[in-house]
Amino acid sequence: MAFTQKPLPFDPGALEPHGMSAKTFEFHYGKHHAAYVANLNKMTADTEMADMPLETVITESFKDPAKSGIFNNAAQTWNHTFFWDSLTPSGGGGTPSGAIAAKIDSDFGGYEKFKEAFKTAAATQFGSGWAWLVLDNGTLKVTKTSNAENPLVQGQTPLLTLDVWEHAYYLDFQNKRPDFIDNYLANLVNWEFANQNLAAA
């Protein structure tokens, strides 16, 4: 069984009005994400991991330093799919609604405090990595991870993510990562996706 790259949940040009160009997706989805999937299939071919769910490959390979290459490509395959779903071209960003809004109010003390925590995590992740909104033992938290690592290996439930590898923003925002973060929070966050993940947790 081969791992597959899921289609983007929107047209590659759909986020142009919100600061993310089709050119970015041409490279980010079409080259970077595709390469992680291809590498994962090469590394797991003819092994028991080829038939495991992707999440299982991630958690199992994380435990074995000899499988770091498999982990990196499996996690990046999953992380990118989750990131695309964390974006929406219609009605994204701004203050959330529904259950996630109430949970943010109770666990962070309001949306503005969540926003500052998320901006800080994303901006201070040194080098490549990810910022996450997760559910950890029933409580919402903001976390950041380096390189390919994700909250699954810590037993946390991811609700949203932002990719802060340079290739995620350099074509559109150059070296201005804080502007990329602000734009994500203001215009692109898919709160409906976060609500779905919270409901399923």
Positions of the model-derived regions?
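Feature for soluble, non-membrane regions of globular proteins
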Residues: 1-201
